[in-house]
């Protein structure tokens, strides 16, 4: 059968989006891996599935597969594209949408200026909830990599993140340390790794090595995790701007127990069909 899909991106973090509300198909990890190949497939960072909800209190179910076929809990840039997609496809007329994900419910707000705000929910710091192996909860941890102690923050935004502060974003060891920390045994579910350079109290630069995808142009949950880490450690104040290789996100967080709000664009690139 032929499936209609839409190619989208949020700050260069690119997605294949499938409507499984009006189309009926069983998508497997092997399909994500096959379609995700940039040489022999469609090519994307993540595959986003729009499904009917299991929960009557939400509008849609949102599933995410990395291009390596692994299913993940959350994707912030994808959430903005999800909101733009369901509105453009007339799957809803609502400008405020509640969506269930593998890690819980998120709320999406399509603003009049075309930007999309996502209530990502409160961050989690308890090591078992990230998950991260540590004797006790702390603001910063030392993790040994190749005999060196690497200082990082660990936080969950529905998916696990490690945040490292760097002095030079252009020369940050993203491709050297990223995969080693991603697969570090203290992160049993693997981890997304953010390299953060604080410019001033309202602006920072960020590069992210994404679990299962490598370095991407942008990572919404990574930007949220980096902002939370920077605010928690007194480096920055809310609201703040995070500049990623693909563009800028605005992040707000009022502190522990409060939700993280992320605002940024979502762009449709093209429509296509793929054989299942």
UniProtKB/Swiss-Prot annotation:
Gene3D superfamilies listed in its UniProt record: Diaminopimelate Epimerase, Chain A, domain 1 (3.10.310.10)
The UniProt record lists the keyword RNA-binding: no
Enzyme class: isomerase
Catalytic reactions on record: (2S,6S)-2,6-diaminopimelate = meso-2,6-diaminopimelate
Active-site residue list: 75, 219
Major location (coarse): cytoplasm
Binding site for substrate: 13, 46, 66, 76-77, 159, 192, 210-211, 220-221
Keyword Isomerase listed: yes
Site residues by UniProt (Could be important to modulate the pK values of the two catalytic cysteine residues): 161, 210
A single GO cellular-component term on record: cytosol
Entry keyword set: Amino-acid biosynthesis, Cytoplasm, Isomerase, Lysine biosynthesis
One biological process term in Gene Ontology: lysine biosynthetic process via diaminopimelate
This protein's pathway: Amino-acid biosynthesis; L-lysine biosynthesis via DAP pathway; DL-2,6-diaminopimelate from LL-2,6-diaminopimelate: step 1/1
Entry's Gene Ontology molecular function annotations: diaminopimelate epimerase activity
InterPro entries from the UniProt entry: DAP_epimerase_AS, DAP_epimerase_DapF
Top-level taxonomic group: Bacteria
Site (Important for dimerization): 270
Location(s) in or outside the cell: Cytoplasm
Enzyme Commission number: 5.1.1.7
Protein role: Catalyzes the stereoinversion of LL-2,6-diaminopimelate (L,L-DAP) to meso-diaminopimelate (meso-DAP), a precursor of L-lysine and an essential component of the bacterial peptidoglycan.
Membership in a protein family: Belongs to the diaminopimelate epimerase family.
Subunit details: Homodimer.
PANTHER family linked: DIAMINOPIMELATE EPIMERASE, DIAMINOPIMELATE EPIMERASE, CHLOROPLASTIC
Protein name: Diaminopimelate epimerase
Annotated gene: dapF
